[in-house]
Amino acid sequence: MALEIYAVKDSITLRDTQLDPRLAQAKFFTSAPTLAHCPPECGPEIGFCGRSNAGKSSALNTLTGQKSLARVSKTPGRTQLINFFEVPHTGGFLVDLPGYGFAKVPDAIKKQWQQHLGKFLAERRTLTGLVLLMDVRHPMTTLDEQMLSFADHRDMHTLLLLTKSDKLSRNQAAKARLTVQKRRPQSLVLNFSSFDKTGIIEASAWINHHMDGSEQ
């Protein structure tokens, strides 16, 4: 089952409809070390960002139904490039951004990554939405807040995925989501798990809505 959505800003109503296979068509397009090396700005883009151990690659693979679209590493912080995945029906991209905060690299390199990430978020005009992934047990760190500040400055749509929700009881996960939602009323906040597929349908609906070009 998939969902059709009707939305104003980030307030979403969900309705049963036929399974939408669009995200399953996503395919790797290119990688870029900096904004200057990114492909030309054309269709809408949804960026995926989060701490280096937040599960970005696993989430991308789960949302697209592909086991190896994005590389999953046992070493947090291996995503050092800006990776573009084309979604054919939109002419746009899902963009896997370098993780921040935990990577086992020299501080100078870590700072360089953060500068490139900040420049991309601030200046990439076709970036219409941002999916911020946070471990449900440790949400809204200082670095997460900084990423959201970039998005707010651009008046960007934001989806907050509280990953690894299967690690908590249903009640604990619900309380964590409510706490974050109260702090971010302008964002959609979802519990999410690549293990038990919690939040997959709602997250897919949000992404498809903000990639359909209707708000460009």
Predicted features by range, described:
Residues A2-K104:
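Conserved G1/Walker A P-loop phosphate-binding module
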Residues P39, N83, V105-P106, T141-E145, ...:
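Short, well-ordered secondary-structure micro-motifs
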Residues Y100-K110, D166-S169:
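Flexible beta-alpha connector loops of hexameric P-loop NTPases
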